[in-house]
Amino acid sequence: MNKKILKLGILTVAGAAIVAMKKSKKEKLVYSYPQTKVKKSDYKNTELNKQKKNSKGIYYSSGNYEAFARPKKPKDIEKKSAYLVGSGLASLAAACFLIRDAQMSGDHIHILEASNIAGGACDGVADPDRGYIMRGGREMEDHFECLWDLFHSIPSLEHPENSVLDEFYWLNKEDPNYSLCRATNHRGKPSENFGKFNIDAKGRKQIMKLFFTANEKLYDKTIEDVFDEHVFDSDFWLYWQTMFAFENWHSALELKLYLQRFIHHIGGLPDFSALKFTRYNQYESLILPMVEYLKQNGVIFHFHTQVTNVIFSFENDQKIAKSIEYIKNNETKILPLTKDDLVFVTNGSCTESTLYGDHHTPANGDAQIRTAGCWNLWKNIAKQDPSFGHPEKFCENVSKTRWESATITTSNTKIIDAIKRICKRDPLSGKVVTGGIISCEDSNWLLSWTINRQGQFREQKEDEICIWVYSLFCATPGNYIHKPMKDCTGEEITAEWLYHIGIPLDEIDELARDHANTVPTMLPYITAFFMPRTAGDRPDVIPDGCVNFAFLGQFAETPRDTIFTTEYSVRTAMEAVYGLLGVDRGVPEVWGSVYDVRNLLDASVRLMDGESLLGADLPMPVEKLKGWILKLIKDTDIEKLLKEYKLIKK
């Protein structure tokens, strides 16, 4: 009944609109829309000022004209220096843009990093004591406009005559990504619903309503405030939740932005055919080429340097970074700054205070969790002005921002055979294996696992595979190991995973104990950026009035884009550099699929698992109204478009 009502409502609105149009031609209806008071003599069609910069000193662009252009060197760039706090993807990207587009000399660029290695959350470590460690993975797609703008300029490590983008492009052309098994149940049996969303009319209505809700109406609202069991019990939500790591208590605003940002990939959600992956882990594939590029250009890295504060002065509506406070070799030091010294700070972190275990030790240690490092830095900066954001909204509820992951390394043939049975590919082929995560839909932990192209590490043995496992419900007892994941050793996590991939019960314990090595990692703030928020909680990339200071990364505010992506980090870096230095080149706008009627039509059919409101058989008199509409659009481009995207049958 609800489905019929929804169809009737949509068709009635469409029919009423057509009736109104016809009637207006005959009766010249007068509408009381507010009129803009502009004299005809004052109006002129023009595209002048189309590329006028906004208050942050940037403008957005699209198309090849801007993408292929090289900007002129900004005025007085030789007098300027840059200090980048943190060495994650956002900071390294900013340094690359300083060199490539702002044409700043590399020896004027300083990267201040608290640890002994660059890369931030984009890691991949072969720890000599613990083993291989990957805290997370990175999913990429065609329309990461800023990311690809950057990496087409970064030389490949293996073949410097090619760019990182060149090799990524060739790899994903020759070995395209897609999954042959998205979810399992009953200990490794493929889900019967593969490829379908199975969401009812009420659930689709809730998604549609969220999609069109103004951002302001979603401030501080959770997903539970806008969805109920009609969405949560669907396969759509299983796919969405496990792919993007959304929890029910996370931000409804961020979910809405995700729906709009990736509307062009709704069809690729069940089988991951929309995604692209690097050849190796992200540290080796993305971070190392950037570090090498920066070093070749003379950029100076300062490791073991923990920045604790940036001190500002406030003069005539200007906010000027005057000094950097930092700790090096257990000494507190102060670096004085001038207006020509630019400061870029990565505020907040999803991997801060990571807790590591090993095959025999859990990664729990909740008592050790702290908001040190970049969280305290952001708090110290935020105390000085409201425009610097509210870090406490994101970092003070660890039970709602954490989950746990683990890296399992094995060469055991029984385990590899079980993997082959599920993913229908050879994990040792060097090509796509799972094609993305496989979610165990009846797992108490909501455990998901994935195997990317092997080896994930250049030094990995030929017969070894690295499996990445993560669980959203890490405080719930498991199905085989009756303990929460957060209290489990690597061996116990392996046993739980082996249970869900169908290893015989009498073989699980031995295989977990003697034929794998697993490193668990607890990430207390991994989904901190998903917490409900309102305007001002995240600072603008360049806060109003800032002369020589910008924020970078996942907790800086930029319009329309979505966090937890490599694109977001690079976009904020590009905006920060272009804005502070006056680089006269457009920042590529977020891909506009949300404004493309073709993507909207396609998504509407796919969300209904191939059904269409206009293509379905409807009860009278709705069927008669539908027929009238179809007759009205016959032999028009509208009819062609609706047929192409299967809203009406050919």
How would you name each of these model-derived features?
Residues 99-126:
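Glycine-rich FAD pyrophosphate-binding loop
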Residues 129-170:
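Conserved FAD-binding subdomain of flavin-dependent enzymes
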Residues 157-264, 276-277:
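Rossmann-like flavin
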Residues 263-278, 340-342, 347-572, 578-595:
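C-terminal segments that line or cap access tunnels to active or ligand-binding sites in enzymes
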Residues 4-82, 100-108, 607-650:
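Extreme N-terminal leader/targeting segments of oxidoreductases
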Residues 86-88:
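Glycine-rich Rossmann-fold phosphate-binding loop(s) that bind the pyrophosphate
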Residues 260-342, 347-348, 360-361, 366-375:
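Helical element adjacent to the flavin cofactor pocket in flavoenzyme catalytic cores
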Residues 91:
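N-terminal Rossmann-fold NAD(P) dinucleotide-binding loop
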